[in-house]
Amino acid sequence: MNNPSETSKPSMESGDSNTGTQTNGLDFQKQPVPVGGAISTAQAQAFLGHLHQVQLAGTSLQAAAQSLNVQSKSNEESGDSQQPSQPSQQPSVQAAIPQTQLMLAGGQITGLTLTPAQQQLLLQQAQAQAQLLAAAVQQHSASQQHSAAGATISASAATPMTQIPLSQPIQIAQDLQQLQQLQQQNLNLQQFVLGHPTTNLQPAQFIISQTPQGQQGLLQAQNLLTQLPQQSQANLLQSQPSITLTSQPATPTRTIAATPIQTLPQSQSTPKRIDTPSLEEPSDLEELEQFAKTFKQRRIKLGFTQGDVGLAMGKLYGNDFSQTTISRFEALNLSFKNMCKLKPLLEKWLNDAENLSSDSALCSPSALNSPGLGVEGLNRRRKKRTSIETNIRVALEKSFLENQKPTSEEITMIADQLNMEKEVIRVWFCNRRQKEKRINPPSSGGTSSSPIKAIFPSPTSLVGTTPSLVTSSAATTLTVNPVLPLTSAAVTNLSVTGTTDTTSNNTATVISTAPPASSAVTSPSLSPSPSASGSTSEVSSASETSTTQTTSTPLSSPLGTSQVMVTASGLQTAAAAALQGAAQLPANASLAAMAAAAGLNPGLMAPSQFAAGGALLSLNPGTLGGALSPALMSNSTLATIQALASGGSLPITSLDATGNLVFGNAGGAPNIVTAPLFLNPQNLSLLTSNPVSLVSAAAASAGNSGPVASLHATSTSAESIQNSLFTVASASGAASTTTTASKAQ
């Protein structure tokens, strides 16, 4: 009986032109490696018959444990020449052929496919070992003889594979078609392997692979089917799958990966396509960032806004873009894809705009009707926003405080001094005036809403038993603090400071206020007057009294009918004096409002005591640091004098022979007047006929031995005391001398 291996050797040596196909679910092709041993036709038919029993369902093979009995009769006579150390080349043929097991290889046991990384590794290995396999075929075609007694299925492609060619024609086209249909039903099951383990032979591997390109597999796989007729090859071409039986040598020396040739350039080109964007993307991002920065600078230089760019692009190129889109492009807040789309359009518009500004030409006929794209439009562009430096702004603020509305010549002078444009200075002053109106809006009555600040000095203690009412050794402060708003003029600040001259004898302190002319008058005597000119009182005393008038910063507008509160330091019994002129208060003002304005308790004053149109003079006790609320009354002739001692009201002790009312402190004597005394010039003849002298009774009884204090209220008319002169003086001499002086006035 002829040995099938002997008949296949000549065909293997000269059968390079014979082609075969190999298929598996992983789309791999393996270079054929011829072996000396071959299987008989009966073995192949039994092998193929067993394929019909394989049930491919789900992710596992139902016939994984089924065995395949292959009847093989090998009469190799050349086994005597093989080395005894090689169990695979023993001359004796075992009587019982072990069964072959059908199993899944590798990841197919769990129904998984090879990952792309594994496929790429196999591709690289196949490319590296392609030439080595070709050399191995030529070297071992004439010498190798192996007995393919058993085979084991494996999905590992990391070892070199040798193929066992079929010596007899086999009609397997229909079987492979069924196999393809079964594999299409279960895509996860890519391949299966037949294994034939033996006790004394290294297991050989049989891989049945399926490739989608059967035609190329026939051209590439050689020495597979040596004696396959043309009909069988045609059936293989039509059905596309092919079969490859490979065996693993006992001592593998190299690794091999078999892949289809046509998938190799695709697999190699795919990483290139993936890597290319990653390599080019950084450069594109840098280019986009640079273009966005350049675009913004050139756009601002041309005088176009982001909204203008969006409208111009819509009219020129038909793509409307909003101002937000242009802003996001400049800020690199758009996606990479959108920025790549927008970049060429913006670049084209920028070039066209620069050509328009430089050459004064139109780049497109549609630009004729586009406002702002022609030469005239460029000239009509709004100017760049002016940024004023800090030092220039400070100088402008100083000029604004001096003159809020300068003339054109003054604006030109300021612009020349600051090296600025005249139009910029003019606009700044206009905007500054509007800002001032927002900060200090004018009221309907034209009054100022800024309050008048009150300043009080530290109090100077005074002995309560001293008959002198005024003793001052330091500068005193006149404080104005309106409770009701001034309606006649806008008074920003009023501060009157009084100083006294100290002599060896008694001194007198006079603070005279002329509201329309000055805001502060300082004098050694106390003489408030609301008249237009400051008035100075002459006090008859043994010592000379000097009068000084000091005018501070003039008011921006006449004080008019304002109210002044005078606080003199060193006063304890009469801590403060509120002096006022004619104030603008409605005639129907309530008593409570006037009393609250005067800082008095409304319960102390009856409505009958307030005649229509009266002026209020309030002397309210308290410490020097306390703030007395001034009273703003209507322009009336009422004079209210409230004199309160630190321990109670001053009692009325006597009236002199001339009809003057004398207030005096009788020491521990009981107080006669327990409530404030109100003197109405319309009802009391004391204020209409003669001046009123308030003299301390204790000082009057002392005669010339001590100084006395007197308050002179001189009325210039019988109906009104609006222009009255109030004098508080500390003079030396007897009470009769003071009374005589009052009569002389």
From Swiss-Prot:
Keyword Endoplasmic reticulum applies: no
SMART domains found in the cross-reference section: HOX, POU
Record keywords, A-Z: Activator, DNA-binding, Homeobox, Nucleus, Phosphoprotein, Transcription, Transcription regulation
Chief subcellular location: nucleus
Ranges for domain POU-specific: 280-354
GO BP term (any one): regulation of transcription by RNA polymerase II
Region spans: Disordered: 1-34, 67-95, 497-559
Assigned GO CC terms: nucleus
Compositional bias ranges of the Low complexity kind: 81-95
DNA-binding region: 381-440
Sequence positions bearing Phosphoserine: S283, S387, S450
Chain positions with Phosphothreonine modification: T270, T276
InterPro entries hit by this protein: HD (IPR001356), Homeobox_CS (IPR017970), Homeodomain-like_sf (IPR009057), Lambda_DNA-bd_dom_sf (IPR010982), POU (IPR013847), POU2F1_C (IPR045703), POU_dom (IPR000327), POU_domain_TF (IPR050255)
Post-translational modification: Phosphorylated by PRKDC.
GO terms, molecular function: DNA-binding transcription factor activity, RNA polymerase II-specific; RNA polymerase II cis-regulatory region sequence-specific DNA binding; sequence-specific DNA binding
Bias (Polar residues) ranges: 1-26
Entry's localization field: Nucleus
Similarity annotation: Belongs to the POU transcription factor family. Class-2 subfamily.
Functional summary from the UniProt entry: Transcription factor that binds to the octamer motif (5'-ATTTGCAT-3') and activates the promoters of the genes for some small nuclear RNAs (snRNA) and of genes such as those for histone H2B and immunoglobulins. Modulates transcription transactivation by NR3C1, AR and PGR.
Known partners and oligomeric status: Interacts with POU2AF1; the interaction increases POU2F1 transactivation activity. Interacts with NR3C1, AR, PGR and HCFC1.
Protein name: POU domain, class 2, transcription factor 1
